[in-house]
């Protein structure tokens, strides 16, 4: 029998898809059994043309969540993101990037590349590069390395430093998602 929680989650996904949502980002998807995703994603996709993106940090599980879980894309955090960040911070040689795409043979097109998101420190923050310009070659690598999608996080295109004393986490080089907060760089760009 299908667990009651699974049926309720299906109802929630269908509710939002009916409202016009065209994709779901599933935070820490690997903490949910792949059997659930195997059951629910085809049911949602049968009714609506939606995209499913998963946050999965265990590379040994990537193929399982793509092939059995039916996810369209997975965040490439522990591969490309961590490697490009290390290169940008002079902690690793650029040649390490080759190993990223080599390890993803057959699924590279299912990986979502990014340099910033709500979990990671902003490139321009003092905790990362202290300047947005080192992000330019990193973004070129992320965007041009393959045919897979690339994500630009709100404010990244303007060099948002995320260095305000905001939210519960304080001054940590990240932009809060838990409180209403204004990105100074985005606000200034809009008002200019």
Give a label for each model feature:
Residues 138:
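Catalytic-loop motifs flanking and including active-site residues across diverse enzymes
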Residues 11-14, 22-111, 128, 132, ...:
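Active-site-proximal helices and loops of the catalytic beta/alpha 8
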Residues 141-159:
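Conserved short secondary-structure transition element at the edge of the structured enzyme core
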Residues 1-8:
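Active-site mouth loops of central-metabolism enzymes
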Residues 123-127:
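Surface-exposed cleft-lining segments at the edges of enzyme active sites
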């Amino acid at each position: 029998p299908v667990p009651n929680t699974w049926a309720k989650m299906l109802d929630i996904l269908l509710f939002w898809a009916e409202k016009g949502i065209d994709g779901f980002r599933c935070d820490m998807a690997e903490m949910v059994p792949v059997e659930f995703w195997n059951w629910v994603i085809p049911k949602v996709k049968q009714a609506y043309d939606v995209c499913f993106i998963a946050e999965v940090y265990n590379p040994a599980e990537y193929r399982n969540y793509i092939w059995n879980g039916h996810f369209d894309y997975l965040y490439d955090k522990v591969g490309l993101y961590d490697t490009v960040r290390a290169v940008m911070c002079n902690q690793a040689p650029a040649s390490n990037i080759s190993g990223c795409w080599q390890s993803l043979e057959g699924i590279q097109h299912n990986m979502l590349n990014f340099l910033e998101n709500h979990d990671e420190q902003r490139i321009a923050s003092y905790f990362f590069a202290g300047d947005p310009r080192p992000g330019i070659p990193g973004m070129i690598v992320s965007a041009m390395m393959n045919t897979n999608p690339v994500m630009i996080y709100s404010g990244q295109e303007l060099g948002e430093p995320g260095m305000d004393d905001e939210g519960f986490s304080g001054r940590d080089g990240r932009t809060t998602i838990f409180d209403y907060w204004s990105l100074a760089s985005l606000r200034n760009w809009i008002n200019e």
